[in-house]
């Protein structure tokens, strides 16, 4: 039993760095973090748009997609028929029409000098939705994850 405690402590220390880098900042709700990462009604240049996201995680995110629509319109997708997500949960919803979006991909640099290329797209999207938390907008469901682009 004495050997177990140091082993457990070692496992906890080693586990720390493998926490997902895409985890949302705990001071934000998942819906607010989704909005920061993926909602951009008017297109911005990727280097500028990504700097706000990268400042939260203190690293260069490799790829990110911005939907050029309002949070309200994306949240309305949560009211559509639910489908199976990539993670096999049943809380995903597909947009009924394509939207303009920008795909930003890291091309060079180390944080905070991250450099991105941009690709404009017009596609359907799938979002995962959950019930809102207290400080979220008062919708029945709110988007919390951009599951895929079609």
From Swiss-Prot:
Its main location: secreted. Disulfide bonds join 46-104, 60-114, 78-129, 85-92. Pfam families: RnaseA (PF00074). GO terms for cellular component: extracellular space; lysosome. The active site is at 38 (proton acceptor), 145 (proton donor). GO terms for biological process: antibacterial humoral response; antimicrobial humoral immune response mediated by antimicrobial peptide; defense response to Gram-negative bacterium; defense response to Gram-positive bacterium; innate immune response. The record marks 59 as: Facilitates cleavage of polynucleotide substrates. The record marks 61 as: Critical for catalytic activity. Residues 1-23 form the signal peptide. Belongs to the pancreatic ribonuclease family. This is Ribonuclease K6.
